[in-house]
């Protein structure tokens, strides 16, 4: 019979797990560390999650918008492959870019400036919305090769290649400014957006910038760089 749940305690445990994974990495995190950070005993922690793997799955699901309070307790232990697949699915769902899908479907956009601005803005919003999950995955990928491959090679690099192909097509049609190397240009676009939508929150001065003003300026400046 499932044990009665305490939503507040579950939230505290998952928040503690997120902070511990983000600070120590996946391999460096221990269940006892999470229990101490959550202010619970290790024994109680295991009544919520069977293992470190289960805790990581809980964190990823919560950051992906899953109602973890509806999950049966204790959460079972997934395999490493299942964890990597969960991260891949969660990030793919969070960073869908409909404006790029629409751009790929036409060779004659009615307004190239609006198209580029829309793509930049949607990238910004997608990264901003899942920045906590992105930071977690980036940190844990440092000591988890399979996760690194899923995130960087099968995830980010695939998207960078797609963005570069978009720039190639629009450049060949004369719709955007000439670009010598669209591979570098795609990384410039994505890394610029990623710093302002995500990494600046870990920067001493960057975190103080006004959120709305940052979004407006990033969209305007990147659009101007590409369209002229």
Residue ranges: model-predicted function:
Residues 24, 51, 129-131, 143-145:
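Short loop-to-helix capping motifs
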Residues 220-228:
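C-terminal alpha-helix
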Residues 59-116:
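Amphipathic alpha-helical linker/stalk segments
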Residues 12, 20-67, 72:
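Helix-turn-helix
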Residues 101, 105-106, 134, 149-153, ...:
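Hydrophobic/aromatic-rich alpha-helical bundle segments in the mid-to-C-terminal region
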Residues 66, 94-97, 130, 134, ...:
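A short secondary-structure junction motif
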Residues 110-138, 146-173, 220:
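Amphipathic alpha-helical packing segments from all-alpha helical-bundle domains
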